[in-house]
A protein has these predicted regions:
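Sec-dependent N-terminal signal peptides
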Residues: 4-13
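N-terminal hydrophobic alpha-helix used for membrane targeting or insertion
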Residues: 10-11, 26, 95
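Intrinsically disordered, low-complexity segments enriched in small/polar residues
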Residues: 12-15, 78
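Boundary at the C-terminal end of the N-terminal hydrophobic targeting segment
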Residues: 18-20
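N-terminal low-complexity, Pro/Thr/Ser-rich intrinsically disordered segments
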Residues: 22-30
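Aromatic-lined, polymer-binding surfaces characteristic
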Residues: 33-49, 53-145
Length: 145
């Protein structure tokens, strides 16, 4: 059984190398592309103007971002065995601040998102004993958003 798994692993690893060599990386859209492609802001602005509930959500996000600007960046403070609450605060802040920057072009939001990412990157760890904490602490979501 071990031999079969080893052979399968060798075969699969060889195939992925071939696929990677054949992939045309020039066809990938430029950044930003993760959640909101370049120019996507205009479609959101139009939807906000046409759909009042969406305008309410947008306004609430902007209010939260403005409030975040007055608060200190997140700190590594565990609750019992968990860092999950802090992870979720960081994720929410980075996501919302990135959105605010893209929608307004105001660099204060981008700078603050960067501060939040730097703050979590300085944590001694992301609580690897609880994988959900680590998963929630994905700061790449803010990168080039």
């Amino acid at each position: 059984m071990k031999k079969i798994l080893l052979l399968l692993l060798i075969f699969v690893s060889g195939c992925t190398g071939v696929v990677a060599q054949q992939f045309d990386y020039g066809k990938i859209a430029p950044h930003p592309r993760l959640l909101l492609p370049a120019g996507g802001e205009e479609a959101i602005r139009k939807a906000i103007a046409e759909y009042p509930p969406l305008a309410t959500v947008h306004q609430r996000i902007m209010e939260l971002c403005d409030r975040t600007l007055t608060e200190p960046p997140v700190e590594r403070i565990k609750e019992g065995k968990r860092l999950l609450a802090i992870s979720r605060i960081a994720l929410k802040r980075i996501y919302y601040l990135s959105y605010a920057y893209r929608m307004t072009g105001d660099k204060k939001y981008a700078h603050r998102a960067e501060q939040e990412m730097l703050a979590v990157s300085r944590f001694t760890d992301w609580n690897p004993t609880h994988f959900l904490d680590v998963g929630e602490m994905v700061i790449g979501i803010g990168y080039r958003l």
